[in-house]
Amino acid sequence: MKIIGLDVGSKTIGVAVSDALGWTAQGVKTIRWDENDLSSADEELEKIISEHEIGKAIIGLPKNMNGTIGERGEASQRYANHIEKVFQIPVDLWDERLTTMAAERVLLEADMSRSKRKKVIDKMAAVMILQGYLDQK
């Protein structure tokens, strides 16, 4: 069963997908969306979910450094409920503290330009979220 990993931001959603064995995560794309309309990314996600035969979703849960859930975390929880209801697949939330910073560091070390980093940072964060989940399984 393949798993989709999502890094949900206010304007974009980074998307990653696991291999069939659940060992590795690969970046798929970054979807632009409007977080005030939870269904604005449904069409693109539907294509990915059916093309890759996804059976589960992992959504990054941004927590504050003290472990509490803030506004962004609540937004991720709302989106997780939406995904579960619309696509009828189980969703787990995964602590994503510092994944975007780690993704930024990896891209900086790869000597990627700022404009290129901006295009792939969310997809890279989704890969790190999903890979973290796969590694602990």
UniProtKB/Swiss-Prot annotation:
Signal peptide: none annotated. GO terms for molecular function: nuclease activity. This is Putative pre-16S rRNA nuclease. Gene3D superfamilies: YqgF/RNase H-like domain. It is found in: Cytoplasm. Keywords: Cytoplasm, Hydrolase, Nuclease, Ribosome biogenesis. InterPro entries: RNaseH-like_sf, YqgF, YqgF/RNaseH-like_dom, YqgF/RNaseH-like_dom_sf. One of its GO terms (cellular component) is cytosol. Its EC number is 3.1.-.-. GO terms for biological process: rRNA 5'-end processing. Belongs to the YqgF nuclease family. Its main location: cytoplasm. It comes from Oceanobacillus iheyensis (strain DSM 14371 / CIP 107618 / JCM 11309 / KCTC 3954 / HTE831). It is an enzyme of class 3 (hydrolase). The keyword Transmembrane helix does not apply.
